[in-house]
Each structure stands twice: as structure tokens, then as C-alpha cells.
């Protein structure tokens, strides 16, 4: 198997990262793409009580097990399968279930802080930052957390103002300078997606 191409997609919470990833996935197909979500690599918190787990700052770099993520990316780069961890936000902890991920031509790494860690940056062939208005992002986050994670409106707003927004400004936004491509207007920018697809094909050609 030829060397896979690693694509990093980052941006603030609710920016449209997953939409971009899904569109790339749609255009190239599941035979060609492996998906790695940074959310799957939150640290195991089995040693903490539920009260302490609830206090976890999920938007801080220390929340992620980047050592495991880097190890898994290197394994995929070398043609080996990995067992991607699973995280259950309802219990604020990693669970025993894992997902087998096989090495593919294209590996998409998606998450709010993937460009914050230089070890991850060095593995990425194409680095994408999805830039979306803060008002749009908070609305999307509210919808997701209420519908998918059982949160209340009050808790989502409180978390956004006290954690998400300051962490975004401190850690996520500054990583924009590392991006090769910055996509305005989130995941619905068709022109930008077409450019990304063309760039992926170009890089794939270099590894043939």
C-alpha cells in the first residue's frame, strides 16, 4: 500500500468541520477514507468520581490523550490497523467499545485542537481551518448538545461563556496560522470543498 495522505480539519466547535469531512468522504468513498475524530481521544477518567468528571474542560488541550492519538496515526501511516477508542459524553468517560480502523489512502483527522499539538501537525499533509461566525457556532453547539448529549439550554450557554469561548480564543483560533487552507462560511462553501478535493488528488498523485 502506498503512503496514505493525512488531512487535518479543525476550527471552533460547531464550525462545520464534520460537514467538510463528510463531503470529502462522500466524494472519495469509504474504500479510500479512514476517519479519526479527536473527540474519540478524550482521556480515560475512570479514576474520577462523576462529580469530578462533570467538571472536565473538554476544550482544553489537556483533556485529550494525544499520545495515544499520535501513536495511532503513526500506526496507520505504517500500514497497521488500530482500535479507535470510544467516548460516552453521558458518563463523561471512555468506554470499553473500540472501533477497528484500517489504513486507507486518505486519513481524515478532525477536531478542535488537532493543530495545537506539533506532533500531529507534522503528520498532516493538508491542514484545513474551518472559519465560521461565533453566533452560528454557538447555535449549532446548543442544538447538538441538547439533542445528542442530553444537556439543558442553561448548561450549554453557561459552558459556552465560561469555557468554550475563552478556550477557543486561547487555543483554537491561534492555530489558524498553521492552516494551509482556511474555509470561510463553514461547511457549505462548495468552491472551497472543490479546491480541497483537487488538492487531495494532487497530493495522492505525488505518492503514486
Curated annotation (Swiss-Prot):
NCBIfam families per record: PRK05480.1, udk
Stated family: Belongs to the uridine kinase family.
EC code: 2.7.1.48
GO molecular function: ATP binding; cytidine kinase activity; uridine kinase activity
Transmembrane segments: none
Keywords attached to this entry: ATP-binding, Cytoplasm, Kinase, Nucleotide-binding, Transferase
Lineage, opening ranks: Bacteria, Bacillati, Bacillota, Clostridia, Eubacteriales
EC class (word): transferase
Record InterPro entries: P-loop_NTPase, PRK/URK, Uridine_kinase, Uridine_kinase-like
Binding site for ATP: 11-18
HAMAP family with a match to the protein in the record: Uridine_kinase (MF_00551)
Associated pathway: Pyrimidine metabolism; CTP biosynthesis via salvage pathway; CTP from cytidine: step 1/3; Pyrimidine metabolism; UMP biosynthesis via salvage pathway; UMP from uridine: step 1/1
Enzymatic reactions: uridine + ATP = UMP + ADP + H(+); cytidine + ATP = CMP + ADP + H(+)
GO BP term, example: UMP salvage
Protein's name according to its UniProt entry: Uridine kinase
Superkingdom to which the source organism belongs: Bacteria
Localization: Cytoplasm
Keyword Nucleotide-binding attributed: yes
GO cellular component: cytoplasm
Keyword Cytoplasm attached: yes
